[in-house]
Regions:
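Conserved active-site segment immediately N-terminal to the catalytic lysine
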Residues: 54-70
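Hydrophobic beta-strand scaffold residues
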Residues: 38-39, 177
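Active-site core of PLP-dependent enzymes with the aminotransferase class I/II
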Residues: 15-34, 45-52
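Conserved PLP-binding catalytic core of the aspartate aminotransferase-like
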Residues: 175-204
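Structural motif
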Residues: 8-13, 39-41, 62, 81-83
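Short, small-residue-biased leader/transition segments that mark boundaries at the very start
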Residues: 2-6
Length: 207
């Protein structure tokens, strides 16, 4: 079997479906008190501004790497990411790249924990459920290398500031946010006349 670690888990998206940021720390406390693991679905861009799921007590973090320099491309292909605590590391599916040093003392990257893999333990391997998204991962690596830590924070800050500016402007003309809690760069609004009427009005103005 997969073991007890897979039997009780809770998934929490933050930002959630409506764009709101959840209280991951509170969710982690509740889950751990009940003996469950907390998995957080995160936007990688938001992680540049806010406390990470790991810092908030989550056990696993997953997400879509599309915001990291990948065009929309009619829906794909994209790359997903998954991170966990050391205690759960061997439960991860797929190949894991680790950082080490080569014979000259320079930084190097290797495939690590290969005892989990198909060529060694085929019947227990997890990589047979994975697809190869190395090209997308390389795109994300190039993007992150180009913008750097400060650049990534600046992009995230621009996303945050402009979304909040837009939300405030909409509220000033009678279209308030539906949710009142904190959000990152997406939000839902109330449409007093209904969404259909709003769409017609936007179309008439070529918006």
């Amino acid at each position: 079997g997969l073991g007890d670690v897979y039997k009780r888990q809770v998934y929490l998206a933050s930002p959630n479906f409506l764009g709101g940021l959840e209280d991951v720390s509170a969710a982690a406390e509740i889950c751990h008190a009940a003996g469950a693991k907390l998995i957080v679905g995160a936007n990688p861009m938001a992680l540049a501004l806010f406390k990470t799921p790991g810092e908030a007590g989550a056990d696993v973090c997953v997400g879509d790497g599309q915001p990291l320099g990948m065009p929309l491309s009619y829906g794909g292909p994209y790359v997903g990411f998954m991170a966990t605590r050391t205690a759960l590391m061997r439960k991860l599916p797929g190949r894991i790249v680790g950082q080490t040093t080569d014979v000259d003392g320079k930084r190097a990257f290797v495939l690590t924990l290969q005892a989990r893999e198909q060529h060694i333990r085929r019947e227990k391997a997890g990589s047979n459920i994975c697809s190869n998204q190395a090209l997308c991962a390389l795109t994300a690596a190039c993007y992150l290398g180009a913008v750097g830590p400060e650049g990534l924070r600046e992009v995230a800050r621009q996303c945050y500031d402009k979304a909040h500016y837009f939300a405030d402007k909409l509220a000033s003309i009678g279209l308030p946010r539906r949710e009142k809690g904190p959000f990152f760069h997406e939000f839902a609004t109330e449409c007093p006349g209904g969404a259909e009427k709003m769409l017609v009005a936007l179309e008439e103005r070529d918006i």
